[in-house]
């Protein structure tokens, strides 16, 4: 092809391109997606926020919902702080944040609870084991229980019970020992009528007695058929277990099993021996 023919072909191509019309802007806008908004521009956003709020509210309600036994436990502990004063359901709901007015099963559990007194009209109060409020009440109660009273049970009666027990111990109006099953004290009355006068000679003899060490005392008790208190024995075993920790053994894996019993010194002649 000569130069004149090439130029003619090029001009035809340019004319063909110019004959093709570009799509107008109106055509593009016709295919543009425009979401339909009903009821104003802000209603869609408001509805979306409302649905999110509703979902979050329901989720929070499900998380905060507690089982019935936990609700009753919280209510019993709250009533205990009132020291026998009755409380209605409104006060209970306000103080415990548990909505129980629309839960008849919770009210039924409260009525049948042995630690709660039902006063009627949805009014409840805590029922302690001992009805005491002062130090004098404690001193009057103790003679009726020769086996002693647990301080934890006495503390259910009123908030300052443990403080009053401590004061009675300091003034030696009561005696206290540790319970074998727990760390709680058992208190007894200090009855002056049970005091027996002793001679100074007998007191000196008592003080001169030397107690054996703990190991010998335990052996002598076992020889006499007496058992050691479980709490003391278990504590001693726990302490000895901590002191006697076994040392971990290092596990070595043998890889060259084909020469496991091979000793390279077997064929080496010893010093002073004749060569083979």
UniProtKB/Swiss-Prot annotation:
Molecular functions per Gene Ontology: DNA binding
InterPro entries: TFA2_E-tether, TFA2_Winged_2, TFIIE-bsu, TFIIE_bsu_DNA-bd
Coiled-coil annotated spans: none
GO annotation terms (biological process): transcription initiation at RNA polymerase II promoter
Subcellular location: Nucleus
Gene Ontology, cellular component aspect: transcription factor TFIIE complex
Top-level taxon: Eukaryota
Alphabetic keyword roster: DNA-binding, Nucleus, Transcription, Transcription regulation
Subunit relationships: Tetramer of two alpha and two beta chains.
Protein name per the record: General transcription factor IIE subunit 2
Organism (species): Dictyostelium discoideum (Social amoeba)
């Amino acid at each position: 092809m000569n130069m004149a023919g090439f130029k003619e072909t090029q001009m035809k191509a340019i004319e063909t391109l110019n004959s093709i019309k570009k799509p107008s802007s109106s055509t593009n806008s016709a295919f543009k997606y425009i979401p339909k908004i009903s009821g104003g521009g802000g209603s869609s956003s408001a509805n979306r926020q409302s649905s999110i709020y509703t979902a979050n509210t329901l989720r929070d309600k499900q998380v905060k919902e507690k089982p019935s036994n936990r609700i009753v436990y919280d209510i019993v502990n709250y009533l205990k702080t009132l020291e026998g004063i009755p409380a209605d359901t409104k006060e209970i709901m306000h103080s415990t944040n548990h909505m129980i007015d629309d839960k008849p099963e919770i009210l039924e559990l409260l009525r049948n609870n042995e630690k709660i007194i039902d006063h009627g009209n949805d009014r409840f109060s805590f029922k302690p084991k001992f009805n005491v409020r002062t130090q004098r009440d404690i001193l009057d109660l103790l003679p009726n229980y020769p086996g002693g009273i647990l301080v934890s049970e006495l503390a259910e009666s009123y908030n300052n019970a443990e403080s009053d027990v401590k004061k009675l111990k300091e003034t030696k109006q009561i005696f206290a020992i540790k319970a074998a099953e727990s760390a709680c004290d058992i208190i007894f009355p200090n009855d002056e009528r049970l005091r027996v006068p002793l001679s100074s000679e007998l007191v000196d003899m008592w003080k001169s007695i030397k107690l054996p060490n703990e190991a010998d005392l335990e052996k002598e008790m076992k020889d006499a058929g007496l058992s050691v208190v479980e709490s003391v024995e278990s504590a001693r075993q726990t302490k000895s277990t901590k002191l006697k920790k076994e040392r971990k053994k290092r596990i070595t894996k043998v890889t060259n099993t084909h020469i496991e019993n091979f000793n390279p010194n077997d064929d080496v002649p010893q010093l002073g021996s004749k060569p083979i």
